[in-house]
Amino acid sequence: MTATKHQRRSGNPAKPPQPRYQPGVWHRNHQFAIFGIVGATALTLFAGFLGPSAVTLTLGPRHSYLPPWYLPANVVKPNEWFVSIVIWVAIVLGALGLWAGLRAMADGWRPKYKKIFVLGTVLSLLTSLVPPMTSADVLMYAAYGRLQAIGRDPYEITAAEVFRSQFDPVLRWTERPWQDTPSVYGPITSWTQLVANKLGGENMHDIVFWLQVFSVVPFILACAGAVMLAHGDPRRQGRAALLTIANPLLIWAVVAGAHNEPLAVMFAVAGLLFMRKNPFVAGLGIGLAGCAKVSIGLWGLAMLWAYRREPKKALLLCLGTAVPMGLAYVLWQPTAFFQALRNGGYVSVGSWANPIYTFLNLFMTEYHAKVVLGVISYIGLIVIAWMLSRVVPWTAAPGLAKDADLKRDPLTIALRTALVLSVAWLITSMYTLSWYDLLAWIPLAVLAANKLDKIMVIRGAALSLAYVPGRAIDMGPALDFTATRIRDTVSPIIQIGMILAVILWWRQPDRPELFPFKKAKALPTTTAPKVTAPQAPASKPPPRSSPSKAARAQEPVPVSELASRRKS
C-alpha cells in the first residue's frame, strides 16, 4: 500500500487538503523516475561532449560556432569501452526510470504535465547540442541532401558512386553500410535534407546541426500534439508527457540519433487532432506524413478504419490524403515511393528474424530466405494485430462526451487501431529499430495504461542496447564480440519474448504479469468467511429441557437402528 500525506494549499486555508504522493518502495518512486530520466540524458550528454569515439560520430572539421559542441580532438581520446559502458548504463537507467514512473502513476502519482513537458523539452534540446551517437543514418541524410545540392537524384544514384570517383567535402564523411544505398525516404524528408545542405554549406558538421534541428523540433511538436490529444484530462496529459517528450528511450533513440521519424509523426498527429472535426483536414495531415515516410501509412489505415461506418467522411479522408501524396509521389518524385518500400526487404540483426534468417541460409539462398521470412512476417503481423485487437482495452480518448459511445468515436478508434497496428508491425517486422517505436509510443501515451507499456519499455531498451556502438567501424575484438552478442543473440531472444508476451496476454487476458512466472493463487476451498453484525450483550440462556417421551417417539429412527430392531 502507498502512504499519502495531506497538505493544505498555501494561501487558501479554506480549501481541503491536497493529497501528495508518498511512495513506499523505490520502483514506485516518482523521484527515482525523474532521477533516471535526467540521469540517462546527463550520461548521454557526457559521452557526446567527449567528442568522436566508438559511440559518437565523426563530423569532420568545424568552421563555425554552431552546435553540435564537443571537446577538441587533442584534449581527450575517449576509450571505446568507457563510452560504450556509459551509454549502456544510460539506457538501463532511463528504462528503469521510465518503468518506475509508470508504476508510480499506477500507484497514484499525478505528475503535472506542464512540468514534465518542460523537463522533456529541455532534455531533448540539450541532447541535440552534442554530436549524434551510435547510428550513422544522419550522415546519409546529409549525403542525400548533398546529392540534390550538386544536381543528382538520391533515388537513382548512391553516395559511394560519387565519392569513389571524385573528392567531395561532405560525402567523404559518410559511413558504411548505407553508402551504396539510394534514398528510401519520402519527398518531404528529402527536401529537409536539401535545406540542411543549403544552410550548412559544404561542411558536414554544420549540415548535421540543421538535420538535428529538423529532428528535435518535429519531435517536440509531435509530443505536444499528443498532450493536446489528451486535453481535458490532466492525468492522461501527464501520462502523455511522460511517455513521449520525457521518455528517455525516445530521447536516446530518436533525438540522440537525429532520426527523421518525428517529421512524419508530427504531420500524422496533426491529422489526428482533426478526426472529430474535419476528415478532409485529417487526410491532409496523414498524407503529408506519408510524404515524409511511407511506414506512417499504418496510421492512415487506422484513421480510415475509424470512418468505416461513415462512407462520406471516409471519402473525404481519402481525398485529403491523395492531395499531398499525389503531388509528391506522382509529380514531384515519381521514383520515391518504390524506393521507400525497399526497407521491407532488409533483416535487422537485433530483430526476432535474424536467428531464423541465419538458419535458413544454411540450406537456401539469401533471396529465398528473405522470401520465407517475409511470408512469416506478414502472417505474424495479421495474427498479432488480431490478438491485440482482442485484448487492448477500450478507453475513450479525452474530450469525448460522457453519453457518447466510445466504440463509435473516430478519434478513439483511430488511436486504438494505430496502436494495435504499430505494435504488431514493430514486433513482427524483419527490419525493426528502436527509433521506429515512436509510431507506437504516441497513441499508447494518449490511451490508458495497459500491458503494452511494459512490452514497449522492454523492447525499446533491448534494441537500444543492441546498437551500442552500432556503427560499422573498426573496434577492439573484445568490444566487438560483446556488442555483437548483445545484438545478434540477446536482443533477438528478447524480441521473440515480446511476441510470446502478446500471445500469452491473448490467452490469459486477466493475468497481470507478462509471463506466468508467478503461480496464480489457488482459490480457498473453505467456505467464505461469515460477516457478522455487532452482537448484543450476552444474556443467560434459558434452562434446557429434555423433550417429552411422546416427542421422542415421533422422531425419525435411522435405518440401521430400525434393521437391528427387526433382527432382534
PLM regions and their residue ranges:
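Transmembrane alpha-helices of multi-pass, membrane-embedded glycan-processing enzymes
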Residues: 189, 193-200, 211-225, 264-267, ...
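Transmembrane helical bundles and short interhelical boundary loops of multi-pass, membrane-embedded
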Residues: 2-5, 12-22, 28-90, 325-400, ...
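Short hydrophobic alpha-helices at membrane interfaces in multi-pass membrane enzymes
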Residues: 269-292, 316-317, 417-420
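Membrane-embedded helix bundles of polyisoprenyl
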Residues: 120, 216-217, 229, 237-275, ...
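Perimembrane helix-loop-helix junctions
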Residues: 298-322
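Transmembrane-helix motifs of polytopic, lipid-linked glycan transferases
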Residues: 93-103, 209-236, 382-390
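Intramembrane catalytic core of multi-pass membrane enzymes that act on lipidic substrates
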Residues: 109-212
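Specific aromatic-rich, kink-prone transmembrane helix
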Residues: 225, 263-279, 386-389, 422
